[in-house]
Amino acid sequence: MSTADPRHIPVLGPEAVAMLAPRDGGTYVDATFGAGGYTRLILATPGTRVIAIDRDSTAIAGGADLVGEANGRLTLVESRFSALAEICAAQAVGQVDGIVMDVGVSSMQLDTAARGFSFRFDGPLDMRMADTGPSAADVIAQASERDLADVIYIFGEERHSRGIARAIVAARKEQQITTTRQLADIVARVVRSKPGDIHPATRTFQALRILVNEELDELEQALSAAERILPPSGRLAVVSFHSLEDRIVKTFLAERSKIGGGSRHLPEIAQQAPSFQLLNRKPVVADEAETVANPRARSAKLRGAARTTAPAHPPSSSSAWPRLADVMRGG
């Protein structure tokens, strides 16, 4: 059954694709295929080709009908989007004309109870975008109290992180925590909320999801890969949904759109020329009509940039984010 809904318009989809300015003969990457919304919008320009990536096998299977409709203009690849440079190389594509990324969990994943992403449904505590690797239940069962607290604080920006971690460790001594309802109830006993507040478990669920899928590392690597495979004038458009994602995108584009690396005190150090030119200094946000139709659009921010002729910046040093493998070893 296809999950690529022809009626699906992704959050800020028309605005993001307008930033790409697709043209006849151009090749584009939809780095987060999902329900296929961005891909459809790009393919609406005759003569375009799209390489669409998703690590979720359900999304890839759901795109089969769209592949047929595209008459050879669409290639679907099941993979992490951090590997987009290698994916393009495997398709004999050295450079692409534009890349769109819609970062984070998809509506399709959130709304499927069996995937375990949401506290709105009682389901298995999974949260994996792919079918491999440790699940959120594995993390809850094995991580140390200190690591749990750090993950919930850093990835969830949750000020009650230590109390939540302490409650999780106490609860798992009594019984296995394997469902979303169990975890949400544990968190709700620690985080008190008033009417109108977000659900007490919102930040904890976000933190576990980010860790399980290594989302922020993935984003940083994907942005660096995009810088390498976009030619001069190639476009990058990124839609993010929470402050950590947006901070990474904003910082990346800010650093690469200004002259840097030199010093008036050490003039012999060569300055790094800007590798991107910003397309918007302030993020594009959804208008009232879109947020009414889709409340998830309220937090969305779109940032874009065009590649310059300057060489790509050297890769950043290793990430400082908590790593899934380290957390799983620490329990």
UniProtKB/Swiss-Prot annotation:
Q: Where does S-adenosyl-L-methionine bind?
A: G36, G37, Y38, D54, F81, D102, Q109
EC number(s) recorded for this UniProt protein:
2.1.1.199
Tell me one GO molecular function of this protein.
rRNA (cytosine-N4-)-methyltransferase activity
Q: What is its main location?
A: cytoplasm
Biased-composition ranges, Low complexity, are 305-323
* Key word Transferase present: yes
Q: What is this protein called?
A: Ribosomal RNA small subunit methyltransferase H
**Which organism does this record belong to?**
Bradyrhizobium sp. (strain ORS 278)
Question: Which lineage ranks, top first, belong to the organism behind this chain?
Answer: Bacteria, Pseudomonadati, Pseudomonadota, Alphaproteobacteria, Hyphomicrobiales
- UniProt gene name: rsmH
